[in-house]
Amino acid sequence: MALGKIKADTLEHSTAGTVDTQYVVNGSAKIWLQYNASHAIQGSLNVSSLADGGTGRGTISISSSMANDDYSLQYSDSCPGSVAVSGIRIISVATGTYATDSCNNSGAYTDGAINCTAVFGDLA
């Protein structure tokens, strides 16, 4: 079976206009992940695994590595009930993994009910 290529400088929708393919390539998330308080993955793109590092801590393994560790990483979570999250942090980044943690108002690590991450940058 032969492998083919699709080459285009722009994408055009019949009613929504056009967009340059550079915007699609450079402006799209290369990784996204949503997981629950039990660290069960609810949905993902380009994630091979999620390691539970203990309460409020997680390490995400990337399926197709990033080109370098200079990518942009967004992380947010929501805690159940009246627990307020006062700190969410990105602990470390590497081409094949990144780690996060979250704390409540008292500074104790806490598992968010819904945890979301997205990564923007270049794939290797």
Please provide the spans of the model-predicted regions.
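Generic low-complexity, intrinsically disordered sequence content enriched
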Residues: 1, 15, 70, 94-97
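Extracellular receptor-binding modules and their adjoining Ser/Thr/Gly/Asp/Asn-rich linkers
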Residues: 2-65, 105-124
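Extracellular jelly-roll beta-sandwich "head" domains, especially the C-terminal globular C1q domain
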Residues: 77-124
